[in-house]
């Protein structure tokens, strides 16, 4: 059943996903080869209607699922009971803080940080993402500020040696680009393919970002 669900997700077939989980809600508990539950697979898909229905059908949420689904009170309850969970990777390799960031759960991210979550902790899967990478991917400026205040390494790399600045430049988000540079992001770091944040902005024609980075590079 999990393989059928995965096929529907790959093909972005929301109606078939919803029909599948309505008929077989137990698939939400099943785990794929990467360690993701059916619920998490749907969450990662970005298919909002299917995700909303999955949350309605799910009866019990583990710690990481509670974060992804924005269940603040349940996350808090887990932390009060098991403090060490704040830095425990999910079965598919992501940190609690990175999951909170990726799903724009800023209040949950704040709760995790207040309870000892390490902002620099990377995923154990091939993505190697940390919370800042996820926050930049979602263009969540406030969370980026919060992570920086909590000492995150702005130059940490994920897969292909991508930094948060590379990601922000790719998105053309000048506000986050400035925030990162003002807090120590190195402009000339290269990805595996040789691109810098400046060259990315130039290629994608994000003129304001390019002009800002080019000026900073020449100082």
Question: Which ranges hold each PLM region?
Answer:
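N-terminal segments that cap or nucleate solenoid repeat domains
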Residues: 1-33, 70-92
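Ankyrin-repeat-protein effector appendages
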Residues: 1-7, 51-66, 150, 183, ...
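Ankyrin repeat A-helix N-terminal signature
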Residues: 7-12, 41-47, 65-71, 99-105, ...
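Ankyrin repeat structural motif
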Residues: 14-21, 47-54, 71-79, 105-113, ...
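Ankyrin-repeat inter-repeat connecting loop/turn
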Residues: 27-28, 85-86, 119-121, 154, ...
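Ankyrin repeat boundary/linker residues
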Residues: 31-32, 89-90, 123-125, 158, ...
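Start-of-repeat signature of ankyrin repeats
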Residues: 35, 59, 93, 127-128, ...
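Alpha-helical adaptor scaffolds
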Residues: 122-125, 129-149, 155
